[in-house]
Design a protein with these regions (language model features):
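Sec-dependent signal peptide recognition
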Residues: 1-8
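C-terminal motif of bacterial Sec signal peptides marking the signal peptidase cleavage site
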Residues: 13-16
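Cap/insert and terminal regions of metallo-dependent hydrolase folds
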Residues: 18-21, 184-251
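Core dinuclear metal-dependent hydrolase active-site scaffold
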Residues: 23-80, 130-193
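Divalent metal-coordination and catalytic microenvironments
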Residues: 58, 89, 96, 144, ...
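Active-site metal-binding motif and surrounding structural segment of the metallo-beta-lactamase
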Residues: 71-118, 194-199, 221
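Helix-loop-beta element that forms the nucleotide-linked donor phosphate-binding surface
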Residues: 120-130
Length: 251
């Protein structure tokens, strides 16, 4: 099966923050939409709206899903209020209480790992579904599975400890979409099955190399892959090289 990699300005590229370090102060990461909304694909109701770096808004059927909303509520003012909010980890480029408090979350369910839920204000308690790695929950007809995300390299293991954060697989009306979160090419990723769209991180030193990301994608063979969570710099994450490696491995 040939993997489609939409790497062009008309498709999804999440441009990362330009800081040299992984910034935990989200005030230094004002989210901006770097490109226009991606149109729905024929036969699919899944629409992608990049915000910045690891954050995005997805429209899927009648549902609106926010992924790791940070950068201030103003970055989301043009979108419908969320039905689902997925939070992957505790770091400031994935989780920001001030942004959440500024959003209209009155009808939203928040899906998060325990490490995130523990940091949420009590006002959100009734809205939160806590998922550990391997657990799942159905909301609005969408099944959300929590997938492990963690580092493998010895020098990077403290960045993302196994069991703390979640990647997610969402299943809805026959489609399956994977969000990797901050991870390396772990066995749990490589063993995924029947993924229609995969959103794969790749940036050093916090996640994985372009080569490892491409190799993992070739292993689990999603129908389509979108690189995200990278810094928009070829010395950190070369998306053209990623596309070349995936195409070569998938030939």
């Amino acid at each position: 099966m040939k993997i489609l990699i939409p790497i062009s300005m008309s498709c999804l590229l999440f441009i990362g923050c330009k800081e040299e370090k992984k910034e935990t102060d989200t005030k230094a990461m004002e989210a901006q939409r770097e490109i226009e909304t991606v149109e729905k694909e024929p036969g699919s109701s899944f629409e992608i709206n990049p915000v910045s770096h690891a954050s995005a808004v997805f429209n899927w059927g009648d549902h609106t899903i926010y992924l790791d909303p940070v950068g201030g509520a103003e970055a989301y003012q043009d979108y419908q209020a969320a039905d689902l909010i997925l939070i992957t980890d505790i770091h400031g480029d994935h989780f920001d209480v001030a942004t959440l408090e500024g959003l209209d979350t009155s009808n939203a369910k928040i899906i998060a790992p325990a490490a995130v839920a523990e940091k949420l204000p009590e006002a959100f308690n009734s809205q939160v579904d806590v998922l550990a790695n391997g657990e799942s929950k159905e909301r609005y007809g969408i099944t959300i599975e929590a997938i492990p995300m963690y580092n493998l390299r010895e020098e990077a293991k403290d960045f993302h400890v196994k069991g703390r954060g979640n990647g997610y697989v969402l299943s809805y009306k026959g489609e399956r979409v994977y969000f990797s979160g901050d991870t390396e090419d772990i066995s749990e990723m490589r063993s995924l099955k029947n993924i229609d769209k995969a959103f794969i991180c790749m940036n050093l030193p916090y996640t994985m190399t372009v080569e490892k990301a491409a190799d993992a994608v070739v292993d689990f063979k999603p129908k389509q892959v979108h690189p995200y969570h990278y810094r928009g710099r070829p010395d950190v994450s070369d998306v053209s090289r990623f596309k070349e490696l995936v195409n070569k491995g998938d030939s």
